[in-house]
Regions:
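HhH-family (HhH-GPD) DNA N-glycosylase catalytic core used in base-excision repair
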Residues: 1-163
Length: 163
């Protein structure tokens, strides 16, 4: 569905345009990238994706560019310090969730071989193409997203719900 029909939600915003043209709808099998998206989605709860994308570089710097091992090892002191970082959403639960989620992701990697293998296990390794032509057609949840969300929650991933 990545086509000119999407332009309305990013036109005139270079950060959103870059995200749309180079990441949205693009398959990426990198665990670090997938962990970054998981964390940023968590940070976006109750906010717009645009807000988070405009804070993305601050998040990358604060959270070791989403290196999973580094995030899993972050100290309470370091996380507390981030609560005063104006570049981040200064919500205690959201900040602390990055470390917690990294620790859970490490367990997922041990079980599945990678975060990527875990994520793709919900679709039997196949990309889903809903045939949507405009953003308004894209559902906010599906049977697969509900199943994935429930499994992530069961494993201890924070902010992994469907809206």
């Amino acid at each position: 569905m990545c086509n000119q029909n999407c332009r309305g939600w990013y036109e005139g915003d270079p950060i959103m345009e870059e995200y749309h043209d180079h990441e949205w709808c693009k398959i990426n099998h990198d665990d670090r990238f997938e962990f970054e998206m998981l964390c940023l989605e968590g940070a976006s709860v109750g906010l717009s994706w645009k807000t988070i994308m405009h804070k993305r570089e601050a998040y990358r710097k604060a959270f070791h560019y989403f290196d999973i091992d580094s995030c899993a090892a972050m100290t309470d002191q370091k996380l507390e310090k981030l609560l005063s970082d104006k570049g981040l959403i200064r919500n205690r639960s959201k900040i602390l969730s990055v470390r917690k989620n990294a620790q859970v992701v490490k367990k997922i990697q041990a079980e599945f071989g990678s975060l990527d293998a875990y994520i793709w296990s919900f679709t039997d390794g196949k990309q889903i193409d809903g045939g949507w032509t405009v953003p308004e057609e894209i559902p906010t949840k599906s049977d697969i997203s509900v199943k994935m969300s429930a499994d992530m929650k069961k494993r201890g991933i924070a902010f992994a719900g469907v809206r």
